[in-house]
Design a protein with these regions (language model features):
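Conserved micro-motifs of the catalytic ATP-binding
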Residues: 60-65, 105-110
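Short conserved segment of the HATPase_c
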Residues: 159-171
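Conserved glycine-rich
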Residues: 198-199
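A conserved beta-strand-to-alpha-helix junction within the catalytic ATP-binding
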Residues: 66-81
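Short helix-loop "hinge" at the ATP-lid/N-box region of the Bergerat-fold HATPase_c
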Residues: 126-127
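Short alpha-helical segment of the dimerization/phosphotransfer core of two-component systems
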Residues: 40-45
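Short alpha-helical Gxxx[C/S/T] motif in the catalytic ATP-binding
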Residues: 186, 190
Length: 221
């Protein structure tokens, strides 16, 4: 695909430059920096290819899967528990789940493992922008039209306003350098999965505090 080729060109150019310089560099510290650049660029290319391949597989698989009535509450609880088991001890980041208890159930028409993937990718994104010992809030509620809403709210730096329309584009990534763990496909995959379920996804910055909010609205059953 042309967009994959375009995205690989940047790390390839950097890789080529670093490899050309390193053989003529005698300074140990400079060589270490160049090796670090080489490693980072190779990993970036590997992530791009792996994620793109997975996305293509997902697109084929999605066309074959059947949707069922499922309660979002139990799926979300399971994913939140899994993430807390990893990140509370690893980085002190806690995922808090807030459910509107006045609502008995949160039924949607969906594919269970794809719903898990939506939340997992959103949490991955929030965690990558969060500093250690912060809280990420996952909220489930319904709007006045009885549509189920899943929100992920973090305490990171938020999105740059002018880039809010771009964050769901394929390969877009505004991630800080120290969090270079993803290819920029995560939110694009989420958008595709949400739209497969007939839903809407929105992103915004928190008005009264730092951080960002991503909201997924599922259609009424």
């Amino acid at each position: 695909s042309s967009d994959l080729v375009h995205e690989i060109r940047n790390p390839l150019a950097s890789l080529k430059s670093a490899s050309e310089i390193i053989s003529d560099t005698e300074d140990k510290n400079q060589r270490k920096k160049l090796v670090k650049i080489l490693t980072h660029d190779v990993e970036r290319i590997e992530r791009l290819i792996t994620d793109y391949s997975q996305m293509l597989k997902d697109e084929v698989a999605l066309s074959k899967e059947q949707m069922n009535k499922i309660d979002l509450k139990f799926i979300v609880q399971s994913v939140v528990d899994d993430f807390n088991n990893i990140y509370i001890s690893k980085r002190g980041i806690k995922i808090q789940l807030k459910i509107n208890n006045s609502i008995k159930e949160f039924k949607i028409l969906g594919i269970e493992n794809r719903i898990e993937q939506i939340l997992a990718n959103l949490l991955d994104n929030s965690i990558s922008f969060s500093e250690n010992n912060k809280i990420i809030l996952v909220e489930i509620t319904k709007d006045q039209n009885d549509r189920v809403i899943l929100s992920v709210i973090d305490q990171g730096k938020g999105f740059k306003e002018q880039k809010l329309t771009k964050i769901f584009e394929r390969f877009y990534s505004n991630r800080p350098d120290k969090f270079g763990e993803h290819s920029g496909l995560g939110l694009n995959i989420v958008k595709n999965l949400v739209e497969l379920h007939g839903g809407i996804i929105n992103a915004s910055n928190n008005i009264n505090q730092n951080g960002a909010r991503v909201e997924v609205i599922f259609p009424k059953l």
